[in-house]
C-alpha cells in the first residue's frame, strides 16, 4: 500500500537537469534515452483548451481572446461551484392589450450548493437559456487597455532595436552582392519577406523581421502618467459605529477570486466566467520525443502516448516493517513487481562509500547478493488460481514468496542514528528490452543489442525508531 496511499515512502532518483526524488507513479520513462524523467525535466506543450463544464473545445487564439474563460459557463461567487441555469414562468402584459397577461419563460443562474442566485445581486432574468448575462463594468477598463497597447508597442520597438544591433555586428560577413544600399532598401521598405529564400540560415532571413515601415505607419500611443492624490476620500461617519453583519461580508477567498472588483459585501458578488482547462503534451528535452500525448477530444480520457515509469521500471514496495532499534539489525520485507511481459533480471546493490546520491541514508542496508528473476506480467494468470507457477531456483533466505510477476525479498537494515526516521538507499539494477530501438537489417542485428542494463537509485522511508 506504500505506493498507493503513501507514495512518498518509496522514492526514485531522477538524474535530469537537477536531481529530483519522486515516487515511481509520478515519473515518466523515455524509451529513447532509457532514463527516468520528472515533470521538471520535460517540455510542456499545450494541445487544446476546453471548458470543464460544457466541454467546448477552442483554439489557443480564441482562448487568449476570451482571457482563458468560457463564455457560457459561470462559477458561483459564493462557493465557487458551477452555476446552473434555472427556468421559471413569469406573467407579462401584452403590448396590444395591457389588461391581458401572457406567461413567458425566464431564465436565471442558481447555485445548487449555497442557494445563491443571480437575482440576489439584481441581475435581470433572460428570455434565452445561454448568453447575454449582464456583467459589471469596471471603471478602469479603458485605462488598462491603453496601458497594454502602449507596452506592447514599446516591446515591439525594443525587439526591432535588438535585432538591428545583431544585424550591425554581422554586416562584416555579408556577401558582396548585399551592399549597404541594398540593406538599407530591404530594411526601410520591408522587402525581406519577398527576397527571403527557402534555405534557412541566410542573411535575408535575419532581415525579414526588421521592417521599419510598419513601425512608422503605426501611430505612437501616448499615455498620461498617473497623478498622485494628496487627499483621499474620507470614510463614512458611521464606519466604526455601525453593527457588522458577518453574513453580508465577503471572505478573503471571495475577494481574491475577483481582484478587479474585490467586493466587500455579498450584494456585490457577481458570477465569474469559468476558467478553461488544457490538455498538454510532455516532451523529453534531450531527444525531443513525446512522453505523454492525450486525445484531442475533451470527452476522452485516453492517451495516444503515455510512457509512465510504472509500465517499464520494476516497482519496489514496502510490505512489512519490524520494530527498528538503534544499532540492531532488522529484517524488512520488500516486494518487487515486474511491469513488462518478458522476464526481468534484477540485482540489488548497496551504495558505494562516497556516493554523491547517497545523502539521505540514516541506516546501513544489507541486500541479497544473488540475481533475482521476475516473471513476466500476465493479466490472465493473476486471476487464475489453478495456474501452475513457474519454477525458479529461489533461496528461501532471500525470497519470501513468489506470485505471478511479484517477488517478496528480504533486506537487512541496521539504523545508525539514535533518533529520527530511518531511511535506507540502494541501487536497483535491471535489464530492459528497448522496443523503440531503430530498425536495422537482419544481418547487422545483434540479438543482445536491444537489451540494456539500467540502474535506479531507490530510497525507502521505514519510519521512526523505537526506544
Curated annotation (Swiss-Prot):
Keyword Phosphoprotein attached: yes
Cross-link type Glycyl lysine isopeptide (Lys-Gly) (interchain with G-Cter in SUMO2), residue numbers: 222
Cysteine disulfide partners in this protein: none
GO cellular component, one term: centrosome
Keywords carried by this UniProt record: Acetylation, Coiled coil, Cytoplasm, Cytoskeleton, Isopeptide bond, Phosphoprotein, Ubl conjugation
Keyword Phosphoprotein set for record: yes
Cell compartment(s), UniProt: Cytoplasm, Cytoskeleton; Cytoplasm, Cytoskeleton, Microtubule organizing center, Centrosome; Cytoplasm, Cytoskeleton, Stress fiber; Cytoplasm, Cell cortex
Pfam families: Dynactin_p62
N-acetylalanine PTM sites in chain numbering: 2
Sites bearing Phosphothreonine, chain numbering: 414
Function: Part of the dynactin complex that activates the molecular motor dynein for ultra-processive transport along microtubules. Together with dynein is involved in spindle assembly and cytokinesis.
Family label: Belongs to the dynactin subunit 4 family.
Complexes and interactors: Subunit of dynactin, a multiprotein complex part of a tripartite complex with dynein and a adapter, such as BICDL1, BICD2 or HOOK3. The dynactin complex is built around ACTR1A/ACTB filament and consists of an actin-related filament composed of a shoulder domain, a pointed end and a barbed end. Its length is defined by its flexible shoulder domain. The soulder is composed of 2 DCTN1 subunits, 4 DCTN2 and 2 DCTN3. The 4 DCNT2 (via N-terminus) bind the ACTR1A filament and act as molecular rulers to determine the length. The pointed end is important for binding dynein-dynactin cargo adapters.
Protein name: Dynactin subunit 4
Organism encoding this protein: Sus scrofa
